[in-house]
């Protein structure tokens, strides 16, 4: 349970960090969507380990294989299965963690819930699980772009106390994001962020930060009232990512400092006769339904739990102990979290697009 996400465009991820591989089954994808392994691979390459000195040195190519659901380069409407085989497992690095719990990791809670856990790489709690999400997100992005011209771009907004301020979510480009290894389009801030990560890596410690993501050209009407509000599903998707600890959309928590008059997005009519808002403090969503403005959201990620510094912990037998974790881990998850956040946004928007068309376009 808990391994599937979505309603009409529904994904189920499978596999473990040190098993034979990881992947995803996508159910509900419309037929005749042109997709290739190369398009999916381009997204996975942004997520894969070992891509720079500030990410985990685990050496995985993460080559994807489409096992079913695509024929002659087009989706068939049947379940799509995508597999990525694990190649660079080093299970011996985790032998000490068989008995000792990593502080702030899922080790203890998995053990307490199930009475058993895969301590090699964390099993299902490993960030390698997100490979399936990113692969599915590549297809969701293709559908969104093809049907509605939606563009989704994520980037690192802040690492520790270093925040990028010279970013316009309405104008930022993928090329700007990918211009440096930290995936921050503010070049000056990016240099400082990289220096921060380099220093913390040398100390065998870790740091966290914030990913901001914008979805542009989102059509009006996506989202459902009450329990299936668009921002609620976006929050669920974002908060299901490993190491995520916070979510906000539009003005977020800063909006609590404003009055209603200051915060309200006043309406206007543009030159094409379309109803627009003068500002976008709502973040593109009002009443749980997209209003046609850009959706802007932020996701906070904690520092990586597995660090090489010695920490106080406990064993499965209930004895106090110390642990200096071995293994290969990200000193900061933010650079690789960018495509993960984009994927979850794409999955939610694609699902709601199909649901909207099914309910509201049936008789039109």
From Swiss-Prot:
Cofactor binding note of this UniProt entry: Reduced FMN (FMNH(2)).
Pathway: Metabolic intermediate biosynthesis; chorismate biosynthesis; chorismate from D-erythrose 4-phosphate and phosphoenolpyruvate: step 7/7
GO MF terms, alphabetically ordered: chorismate synthase activity; FMN binding
This enzyme's EC code(s): 4.2.3.5
Chain positions recorded as FMN binding sites: 124-126, 287, 302-306, 328
InterPro entries documented for this protein: Chorismate_synth, Chorismate_synth_AroC_sf, Chorismate_synthase_CS
NCBIfam families membership: aroC, PRK05382.1
Oligomeric form and interacting partners: Homotetramer.
Entry function: This reaction introduces a second double bond into the aromatic ring system.
Protein name in UniProt: Chorismate synthase
Provenance organism: Picosynechococcus sp. (strain ATCC 27264 / PCC 7002 / PR-6)
């Amino acid at each position: 349970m808990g391994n599937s996400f979505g309603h009409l465009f529904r994904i189920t991820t499978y596999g473990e960090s040190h098993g034979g591989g990881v992947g995803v089954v996508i159910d509900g994808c419309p037929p005749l969507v042109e997709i290739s392994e190369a398009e999916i691979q381009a997204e996975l390459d942004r997520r894969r380990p070992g891509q720079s000195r500030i990410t985990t040195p685990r050496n995985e190519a993460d080559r994807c294989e489409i096992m079913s659901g695509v024929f002659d380069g087009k989706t068939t409407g049947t379940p799509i299965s995508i597999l990525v085989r694990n190649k660079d497992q080093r299970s011996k690095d985790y032998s000490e963690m068989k008995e000792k719990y990593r502080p702030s990791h899922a080790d203890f809670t998995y053990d307490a819930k199930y009475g058993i856990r895969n301590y090699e790489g964390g099993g299902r709690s490993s960030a390698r699980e997100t490979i399936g999400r990113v692969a599915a997100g590549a297809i969701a992005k293709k559908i969104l772009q093809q049907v509605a011209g939606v563009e989704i771009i994520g980037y690192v907004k802040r690492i520790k106390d270093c925040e990028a301020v010279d970013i316009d979510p309405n104008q930022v480009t993928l090329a700007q994001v990918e211009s440096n290894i930290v995936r921050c389009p503010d070049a000056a801030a990016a240099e400082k962020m990289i220096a921060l990560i380099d220093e913390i890596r040398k100390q065998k410690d870790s740091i966290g930060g914030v990913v901001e993501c914008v979805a542009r050209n989102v059509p009006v009407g996506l989202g459902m009232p009450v329990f299936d509000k668009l921002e609620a599903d976006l929050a669920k998707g974002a908060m299901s990512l490993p190491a995520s600890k916070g979510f906000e959309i539009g003005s977020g928590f800063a909006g609590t400092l404003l009055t209603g008059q200051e915060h309200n997005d006043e309406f206007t009519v543009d030159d094409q006769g379309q109803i627009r808002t003068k500002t976008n403090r709502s973040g593109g969503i009002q009443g749980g339904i997209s209003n046609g403005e850009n959706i802007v959201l932020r996701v906070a990620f904690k520092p990586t739990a597995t660090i090489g510094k010695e920490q106080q912990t406990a064993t499965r037998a209930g004895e106090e102990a110390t642990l200096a974790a071995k293994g290969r881990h990200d000193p900061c998850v933010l650079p690789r979290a960018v495509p993960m956040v984009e994927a979850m946004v794409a999955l939610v928007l694609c699902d709601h697009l199909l649901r909207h068309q099914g309910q509201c376009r049936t008789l039109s």
